[in-house]
Amino acid sequence: MILVVLIKRGQQFKGGESMINVNEFNYDIVKRAFNHAKTIRTNKKITYYEIVTSFDIETTSAVQKGQKFAFMYIWQFAFENVIVYGRTWEEYQHFISKLVEILQLNEHKRLIVYVHNLGYEFQFMRKYFEWSENGVFAVDTREPIKALTTTGIEYKDSYILAGLNLDHVAKNLQHHKIQKLVGNLDYTQIRTYKTHLTDEELAYCANDVKIVVAYIHEQIEEYGDITKIPLTNTGRVRRYTRQQVYFNGQKQHRKTGGQYEKYRKLMDTLTLSPFEYEQLKRAFQGGFTHANANKQGKVIDNVTSYDFTSSYPTVMVTEQFPMGRGFHPKIKNRKDFNFYRGHYCLVFDIKFTNLFPKIKQEHYLSSSKCKCSNDMVEDNGRIFSASMVETTITNVDFEIIERAYEWDKAEVSNVIAYRKEYLPKNLIKAIIHLYKNKTKLKGVPEKRPEYMRSKGMLNSMYGMSVTNIVHEENNYLNDDWTTSEPNLKKEIVKYNHSKTRFLFYPWGVFVTAYARRNLWTGIISAGNDYCYSDTDSIKIENGEKHLPYIKKYNQVVKNKVKDVCKKYELDIEDFEPFTIKGKQKPIGYWDSEGVYDKFKTLGAKRYLVFQNGKLMLTCAGLSKSKGVDYLLKVSNNNIDKAFQIFNDEMTVPSQYTGKLTHTYIDEPVKALVTDIDGNKVEVNPLSGIHLAPTEFTLSISKIYNQFLLALIHGELLIKDVQK
């Protein structure tokens, strides 16, 4: 609902809305609004008001005598189109207590309040309220995404729901036109509750809660009511997928022809043992991201970039995955091993003796996932050679390792084998539906929100398949964060018997393995022309020379798509949709991103390119836009000089990084500060987060530097260099 309220008192600011000081607020507005508000009772016997509210604060960070502290100087609370603000926590406590009194809230009758990045606000306000036992749900220490007070105020995080910052949330609103205001608050200035705020500054404060209110209204339109909105973005995807696989996407579950029973029967066969789960966790790896050490630090002209069209979704719809319970096959020799790895999905422990590379351009094994001898030679986190390497892998990983290394001896143990089949038909259809929507909606301005939703959900399909079954619990109790170790056996039993589960953890382990294998076909084919790779993309020299490989690979994908379509009687056109401009985008193909005029890499997630007159930077820990701005500034827009400056000694001053250091303050602080108006004010925050701009230094590790020097001086041996 949208409240239409005539407000006679309150401060008007640009845009025509009213922002009411809490000390002038007429609480009759609340009574009138909530008297007509809809309430919803859930199956857990909890009643919620369906009124959209949002809360936000602005803070100041300061340092005195080496002590860091931070404090709030304005809060704003929106319920529908009414925005109330105050300047102190005492005012906010009083405001909330009045809401609780008027609405008769308690732990069984609640009001949901959305906060964009709840973890930040929670650190400032947590000691001002009493929290319900087990009422704070966190994904990590200091990262609550839901927090319930004993008086029935239920804070939820809209950031983890949207997966976007407020600027992008505003841009993707479908029915509301609100822009995130920028540039109106200088966060380096000291402001307190006594600091005068201009109309523009108040507009900035109000705008953030307005965006959240508009966003939540659109979520209600999508899901039906406020209690049905998922807690997280992944929850959104889970709900969509569960509906597709169990009920064919239909709301009338009785009309699904027994689909629920069929899928439930499959899930009952897909169970794990604690030992099996731990072995699978050891075998799991993410995307492969690395640079060819032979190209490191060099400025290379005419580098072609190729990327896969939806890499993870592709393998999910074209490859075969573990089905049924795992078993321990009897493997007596290499012949047995080759049979099982050709006909089953395998996970196993392996020990290599005297491991050496047999290709120059790249090394596959991650040192962080292996136990190695002291003589290991490391290539920026990847194993070049070692006299002993122990690790846990899949049979798909072994395919890559065979092509990248040689060894004197390999000992395999603890082999778990799974019958392999395509993923269930309805799951594949759900993935392809999202891919088709993403492709058709891309580049259509009025459909941007729907495009972003389909794209985000498609990208989350893989992520939810590898969510840890067993993880630490993060608890907030007595003003403190604690973690508790889970009971492995108990959690695995719970997982196996879950009646809502629709995924199998081993599927996710093999999704990334297949994707790495696909990427490595390009790395190996490119040979010495290979420069860099990142999960689903590859940068190579002499791009035209490698077109035969690209075409051959794409044909392999096309054949795999044909096979799965034949198996499940699916329409191949859904796998090859057209964009708005009439370009066909088959899923899984290598697609050219064009040619870089200049390219330079300093290692994983560190590269600079110049293309079509534009400088572009990817550097972990540094804002892309801020980093480019700095390089252009110090190079005086000289591109060649910018590439020279981008090296392992580059330091970006704090004012150019866009990077903030977060320091958590858990103890009360009393300090006398002078604000920008000259007011001397005593502040006494109970807790908070101090934010400070920080510089960025691009440095190469000592171990990697030693490897590069040895490589340059020809001190590293490659056992059998590829022809």
What is the meaning of each model-derived region?
Residues 1-18:
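Short, Lys/Arg-enriched N-terminal segments with co-localized hydrophobic residues
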Residues 20-113, 124-145, 271-299, 308, ...:
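Conserved RNase H-like, two-metal-ion catalytic cores of nucleic-acid enzymes
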Residues 55, 156, 298-312, 454-458:
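Conserved catalytic palm subdomain of right-hand nucleotidyl-transferase polymerases, strongest
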Residues 81-197, 203-207, 211:
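Conserved DEDDh/DEDDy metal-dependent 3′-5′ exonuclease domain
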Residues 220-296, 324-327, 355-531, 540-723:
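C-terminal, non-catalytic extensions of nucleic-acid polymerases
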